[in-house]
């Protein structure tokens, strides 16, 4: 079976909530993988990723995300994201499309078990027209 999980980890906390939620998510993925299932979990980590550079805008005086602990994942679960475009913008003021007064983050992506082959991942730059997040898409093959 294909198991899809949509998640939104805790925001604006000291990090403990996200750590606990991530552990719970990984335990769910491990249990489903042991059953022989394909598992894809996608959503808002509210954490950035170690290899993702500061993606733009000024973070001064704004929320700063923690870093996702990718090294704590089991070897058969991969972290997948598009490191070329921001997936989220700051919410401290209305967004009019002018990027100079906002902070931008890369905090959205996927966790996938190794029986799911990644073909493509892309953050679609909609300039935050509909949300404070841009959509992130994946194309995969179940192996």
For the regions a protein language model found, what residue spans apply to each?
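Solvent-exposed loop/turn segments connecting transmembrane beta-strands
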Residues: 14-17, 127-132
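Beta-strand-turn-beta hairpins that frame and shape the catalytic cleft
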Residues: 1-6, 116, 140-143
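Low-complexity, intrinsically disordered Gly/Pro/Thr-rich segments
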Residues: 116-127
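Short, well-ordered beta-strand micro-motif
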Residues: 110-112, 137-141
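Active-site metal-binding loops of divalent metal-dependent hydrolases
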Residues: 7-9, 43-45, 134
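Residues that flank catalytic or metal-binding motifs in active/ligand-binding sites
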Residues: 5, 103-107, 132-136
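Metal-dependent phosphoester/phosphodiester hydrolase catalytic core
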Residues: 1-19
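Metal-dependent phosphoesterases centered on the DNase I-like endonuclease/exonuclease/phosphatase
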Residues: 14-115
């Amino acid at each position: 079976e294909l198991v899809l999980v949509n998640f939104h980890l805790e925001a604006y906390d000291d990090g403990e909530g996200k750590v606990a939620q991530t552990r719970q998510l990984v335990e769910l993925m491990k249990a489903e993988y042991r059953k022989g299932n394909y598992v894809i979990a996608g959503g808002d980590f509210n954490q950035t990723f170690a290899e993702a550079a500061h993606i733009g805008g000024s973070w001064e005086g704004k929320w700063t995300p923690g870093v996702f602990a990718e090294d704590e994942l089991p070897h058969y679960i991969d972290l997948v994201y598009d490191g070329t475009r921001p997936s989220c913008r700051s919410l401290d003021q209305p967004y009019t499309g002018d990027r100079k007064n906002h902070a931008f983050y890369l905090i959205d992506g996927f966790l996938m078990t190794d029986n799911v082959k990644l073909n493509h991942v892309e953050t679609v730059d909609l300039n935050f027209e509909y949300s404070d997040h841009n959509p992130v898409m994946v194309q995969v093959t179940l192996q």
